[in-house]
Amino acid sequence: MPLPDFHVSEPFTLGIELEMQVVNPPSYDLSQDSSMLIDAVKNKITVGEVKHDITESMLELATDVCRDINQAAGQFSAMQKVVLQAAADHHLEICGGGTHPFQKWQRQEVCDNERYQRTLENFGYLIQQATVFGQHVHVGCASGDDAIYLLHGLSRFVPHFIALSAASPYMQGTDTRFASSRPNIFSAFPDNGPMPWVSNWQQFEALFRCLSYTTMIDSIKDLHWDIRPSPHFGTVEVRVMDTPLTLSHAVNMAGLIQATAHWLLTERPFKHQEKDYLLYKFNRFQACRYGLEGVITDPHTGDRRPLTEDTLRLLEKIAPSAHKMGASSAIEALHRQVVSGLNEAQLMRDFVADGGSLIGLVKKHCEIWAGD
């Protein structure tokens, strides 16, 4: 399929996707019933969309195009109410978190969907292992060239986005010692990590043509980059965050990305170059492994900076943009989080350290989601 032309969209508008866990009490293991839930809610959703993801234990909530995070929060709240009622009617529960702490990937059923079945054929067991749960944020752009500039700008802050949203310390019944273990699942995919370097939309079109020669890439949706342009929506899509435990934190993360995008495209503070990515995976690893306690390294100077310090600096820089976008409350909440030094991964570990079980942890996550 040829790459579509870049659809011009209103700059800085938002679209947010949350991949949710469908769990089966009292075991609180993952259920395989997302199709049943989707059928139950399809005529009751008035804003946004509830749809499949890769496996039958995943449920995706997606907003419509939103002006600001307040509108997005309203749409998510409406969807959440309908989904929680349908889940209760079918004796299921819903929660966030980047991984389910003890599910076995071998039990996961890939959705009966042509695209997902083709992906299963291409990638085999890796697709079942990709039963992990992330938040994706789309930001509108006026042109393809703006999208490429924005993608490179946002890529500088991938460690910050990962550390602030880290919520996947447990996997397959084990403490991984990572704050965010979810991104590691995609390391075996040939398109893992950052997009290959291009400097403008014309070069991106050439890149996509080259990738399509592999026959594994039919559309943008087949690419698993950390951040990717979405020409059919006219957006840049940030894909590195774990699904938060609460709607409020998900909305705050979207506000952070919207405000950062506004600052980047308005101020144009960087002259991007390929060398910017030289230490990308090292810095990304620091955020995944250590969360806010990670240390990032500047590829141009060799300077090393605590991620906490650099995140506070980013929040300060984008504060005027956040005000213009109606996202000041999000930046203030994230500032408090950074100062406290806590992320959701640490709260999960604290629960287990205090004697809680992994089953109890999932139960608690369901209560948190329903109560937010």
Swiss-Prot record:
Pfam families (alphabetical): GCS2
Annotated InterPro entries: GCL_type2/YbdK_subfam, GCS2, Gln_synth/guanido_kin_cat_dom, YbdK
EC number in record: 6.3.2.2
First and last residue of the signal peptide: none
Catalytic activity: L-cysteine + L-glutamate + ATP = gamma-L-glutamyl-L-cysteine + ADP + phosphate + H(+)
Gene3D superfamilies membership: 3.30.590.20
SUPFAM superfamilies: Glutamine synthetase/guanido kinase
Molecular function (Gene Ontology), one example: ATP binding
Alphabetical keyword list: ATP-binding, Ligase, Nucleotide-binding
Subunit structure: Homodimer.
Listed HAMAP family: Glu_cys_ligase_2
Identification of the protein by name: Putative glutamate--cysteine ligase 2
Gene (UniProt): ybdK
